[in-house]
Swiss-Prot record:
<keyword id="KW-0820">tRNA-binding</keyword>
<dbReference type="InterPro" id="IPR011063">
    <property type="entry name" value="TilS/TtcA_N"/>
</dbReference>
<feature type="binding site">
    <location>
        <position position="227"/>
    </location>
    <ligand>
        <name>[4Fe-4S] cluster</name>
    </ligand>
</feature>
<keyword id="KW-0694">RNA-binding</keyword>
<dbReference type="InterPro" id="IPR012089">
    <property type="entry name" value="tRNA_Cyd_32_2_STrfase"/>
</dbReference>
<dbReference type="GO" id="GO:0034227">
    <property type="term" value="P:tRNA thio-modification"/>
</dbReference>
<keyword id="KW-0411">Iron-sulfur</keyword>
<protein>
    <recommendedName>
        <fullName>tRNA-cytidine(32) 2-sulfurtransferase</fullName>
        <ecNumber>2.8.1.-</ecNumber>
    </recommendedName>
</protein>
<dbReference type="GO" id="GO:0005524">
    <property type="term" value="F:ATP binding"/>
</dbReference>
<feature type="binding site">
    <location>
        <position position="139"/>
    </location>
    <ligand>
        <name>[4Fe-4S] cluster</name>
    </ligand>
</feature>
<dbReference type="GO" id="GO:0000287">
    <property type="term" value="F:magnesium ion binding"/>
</dbReference>
<dbReference type="GO" id="GO:0016783">
    <property type="term" value="F:sulfurtransferase activity"/>
</dbReference>
<keyword id="KW-0408">Iron</keyword>
<keyword id="KW-0819">tRNA processing</keyword>
<comment type="similarity">
    <text>Belongs to the TtcA family.</text>
</comment>
<dbReference type="InterPro" id="IPR014729">
    <property type="entry name" value="Rossmann-like_a/b/a_fold"/>
</dbReference>
<feature type="binding site">
    <location>
        <position position="136"/>
    </location>
    <ligand>
        <name>[4Fe-4S] cluster</name>
    </ligand>
</feature>
Length: 297
């Protein structure tokens, strides 16, 4: 929100979005909140995510990351720094034990425009996935298809996800170790149909900060393993590896993420990324000069 002079109010202004009602008053929390807002805003600007007047479908699973995403985006909008319309969306996929009333009550109490949709994709996944295999891959594909459909129905131009810096790093190493390719989650992506952007505004945010924020705000976090399926073994192994590196060398994740933003195609052996055939030395000037012959003694 801006004052009469047009200046953006400081984050510590008394007027706050209802999503921040009950926020701790500690210096530590204020620093965390400012850091989340600063890093999210930086990602939005770096990857040119904003097109004024657009409508964003903000996906809310009930996990710590999506709560953080929702709160920070509304904070930016509240401060006049995000000129888009926000619509929160939860897709209830029919997982057993999913608390169907938690998110509608949470969003209504905090005056957040939202849409709750029920689609029993859980039964489809149970039917299609062999026993002992993880549900995550098929479940995410079905969820993505439904979210794209909802975005179109609601007139949204972007689907906004809560993936953070750690998710991006983990995906990079999973592709490196198990997929044989250098790829991860881009902060901004155009879907195959070309009608929707997929945005990840938390791309610069650490998972630990999302966890601290959601805990401090006492948001009603819903566990992600209600279906009985755990995260894929590969991702868990990569997460443990990154944790070990971080404990041995604090700040390692930050350095690795900076490397993902500093790619040099000419220093990688992929001929599709760089025209190595054009790297031919020009010997014309060299041949015209008298070059002394070195003789062995």
């Amino acid at each position: 929100m801006r004052d009469e002079t047009g200046e953006t109010q400081d984050l510590e202004a008394e007027e706050i979005h209802p999503l921040f009602h009950g926020a701790p008053g500690s210096t530590e929390f204020r620093k965390l909140r400012k850091r989340l807002v600063r890093e999210t805003r930086a990602a939005i600007e770096t990857y040119d995510m904003i097109r004024p007047g657009d409508r964003w479908l903000v996906c809310l699973s009930g996990g710590k990351d999506s709560y953080t995403l929702l709160a920070v985006l509304h904070e930016l909008k509240w401060r006049g720094l995000l000129p888009v319309e926000l619509l929160a969306c939860n897709l209830d996929q029919g997982q057993p034990g999913f608390p169907a009333t938690v998110l509608p009550e949470f969003l209504t109490q905090r005056q957040v425009p939202h849409r709750i949709e029920y689609q029993d994709t859980y039964s489809i996944v149970k039917e299609k996935v062999p026993e002992g295999r993880t549900y995550c891959s098929l479940c995410s594909r079905l969820r993505r298809g439904n979210l794209y459909r909802i975005a179109r129905e609601e007139g949204c131009q972007a689907v906004v996800l809560g993936h953070h810096r750690d998710d991006i790093l983990e995906t990079f190493f999973m592709n490196l170790f198990h997929g044989g390719r250098l790829a991860s989650m881009p902060p901004k992506l155009l879907n195959e149909e070309g009608d929707l952007n997929v945005l990840r505004p938390l791309a610069f945010v650490a998972e630990a900060d999302c966890d601290r924020f959601a805990r401090a705000m006492n948001y009603p976090v819903i566990p992600c393993d209600l279906c009985g399926s755990q995260e894929g073994l590969q991702r868990m192994q990569v997460k443990r590896l990154l944790d070990e590196w971080e404990s041995r060398s604090p700040g390692r994740r930050r350095v690795m993420f900076r490397a993902l933003m500093n790619v040099r195609p000419s220093h990688l052996p992929d001929p599709k990324l760089f025209d190595f055939t054009a790297l031919m030395p020009d010997m014309s000037d060299f041949r015209e000069k008298d070059v002394p012959i070195l003789r062995e003694h």
